[in-house]
Amino acid sequence: MPIIYRRMTRDEALQSADIIVQAYAKPPWHEEWSIQNAISRIDELTTTPMCLAVAAFDAQRPVGFAFGLPHTSVMGRGIHVAEIAIRPQHQRSGIGSCLLKRLEEEARIMGYVHVWLVSRCTGGVADYYKSNDYQQSEKLCVYSKKLT
C-alpha cells in the first residue's frame, strides 16, 4: 500500500501518540516514554496556535509525523520542527525525509522563511539532517537545567 502524506488533525495525532513511544525507544535515543507523556506532548504541540502537523499514512494508520511550531526571530517568520517520529518498522525508508519536505512546503505556503530544529550533533541523526540540507549552527548550542 502506498504511503500518503497530508496534514494531520489533532484527534489523529492524539490517537497516534504511541509513535513517540515506539520511535524513541530505539537507538540512538533509548528513551522510555510512557503513553501518557506522549499524549501530553502531542496535546502541547497541537494546542499551540499555528501548529503545523503533517503525517505519513499507510492506508488509514499514521506511520510517522512531524510537528512544526511558529518561531519568529531576527531572520523573520520561522518554523521550529518540534517533533518528528517514525514507527521503527518504517524508519530508514525515506518517510522522514518526505515528512520534512512536506512540512517545509506547507510552511513556505504559509509564509515562513526559515526552518530550524534541535537534535543530536553527531551520528546517524546528524547525518540524516545534513542529507536533508540542514546545517549545524556555528553560533548556538542547547542549554538545559533540571528544576529541583
Task: Tell me what each language-model feature is.
Residues 10, 21-43:
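Conserved GNAT-fold acetyl-CoA-binding loop/helix
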Residues 97, 109, 121-139, 145:
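Conserved active-site alpha-helix within GNAT-family acetyltransferase domains
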Residues 2-18:
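A short beta-loop-alpha structural element at the N-terminal edge
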Residues 71-81, 91, 137-139:
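A conserved beta-turn-beta hairpin within the catalytic core of GNAT-like acetyltransferases
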Residues 55, 61-70, 80, 85:
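Conserved beta-strand in the GNAT
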Residues 100, 107-120:
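Conserved GNAT acetyl-CoA-binding A-motif
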Residues 43-55:
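A short helix-loop-beta-strand connector motif used in the catalytic cores of GNAT acetyltransferases and
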